[in-house]
């Protein structure tokens, strides 16, 4: 999710991009709002720099083991991660709409947990700027966790 700035970021960083195939495809796919060949620019920016990851397959970066898992969100192939180093486990979950049985299982035994929750249900409902459709999407089980 939120990979829109990746192309610009990669201009100043020389690093691999760990990304699922579905997320990569969604990132490259041109949206009607993207013009001037942005889709091709995105494809060029990540060419030969991606390491494909999967929610069911652990991977390692340096000495840190990563245990990815699927989370419910309305974007292409969203993951949470448990990172483990020397027996210490820290979980990160950014965009997800609800806590599932799988999430509970993955968080069990973690030494630290970082969770993004970015709205108050009452404030969101009262917000005059957001459309009702957007509010419903945010509040859904595949939207965003409330505070």
Model-predicted segments: where are they?
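Short, structured coil segments at secondary-structure junctions
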Residues: 12-13, 46, 109
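Short active-site oxyanion
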Residues: 12-17, 90
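Cap/insert and terminal regions of metallo-dependent hydrolase folds
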Residues: 101-147
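Active-site neighborhood of divalent metal-dependent phosphoester bond hydrolases
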Residues: 23-50, 83
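Short hydrophobic/aromatic-enriched beta-strand-loop microsegments
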Residues: 16-21, 49-53
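Core dinuclear metal-dependent hydrolase active-site scaffold
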Residues: 4, 52-109
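Glycine/Thr-rich phosphate-binding loops of Rossmann-like dinucleotide-binding domains
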Residues: 3, 27, 123
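Di-metal (Zn2+ and/or Mg2+/Mn2+) metal-binding site signature of metallo-dependent hydrolases
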Residues: 1-13, 21-23
């Amino acid at each position: 999710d939120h990979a829109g700035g990746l192309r610009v970021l990669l201009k100043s960083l020389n690093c691999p991009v760990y990304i699922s195939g579905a997320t990569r495809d969604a990132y490259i796919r041109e949206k009607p709002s993207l013009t001037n060949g942005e889709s091709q620019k995105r494809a060029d920016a990540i060419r030969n720099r991606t390491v494909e990851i999967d929610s069911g397959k652990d991977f390692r970066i340096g000495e840190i083991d990563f245990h990815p898992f699927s989370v419910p969100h309305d974007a292409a192939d969203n993951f949470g991660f448990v990172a483990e180093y020397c027996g210490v486990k820290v979980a990160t979950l950014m965009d997800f709409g609800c806590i599932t049985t799988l999430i509970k299982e993955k968080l069990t035994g973690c030494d630290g947990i970082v969770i993004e929750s970015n709205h108050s249900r009452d404030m969101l409902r009262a917000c005059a700027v957001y459309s009702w459709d957007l509010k419903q999407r945010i509040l859904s089980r595949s939207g965003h966790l409330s505070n």
